[in-house]
């Protein structure tokens, strides 16, 4: 039984945002918070996978950021990381607060959609 879960945080950002800045900011904050603990979790995960018939997957050792198109209005900026289930909510809340604080500090680089449909 695998003792961790993959968790995600998603923000909607405008197409005109500085996507490199958004990705770097989200990744850096997640790495600062999770650090070596995530590396250990990934090692455990890959060891467990090696004992299964599942083909070798590429498992990232650090938090990763991906972007997805969300309709015609904005992009989803998503950071993925590995966490213990009991800590998931607390860590997610802490990460969201820190990410929003840093992203909001650069309003010319991080443009959030100006709509009530968020």
Residue ranges and their predicted role:
Residues 1-118:
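Structured, soluble regulatory/oligomerization domains located on the cytosolic or IMS-facing side
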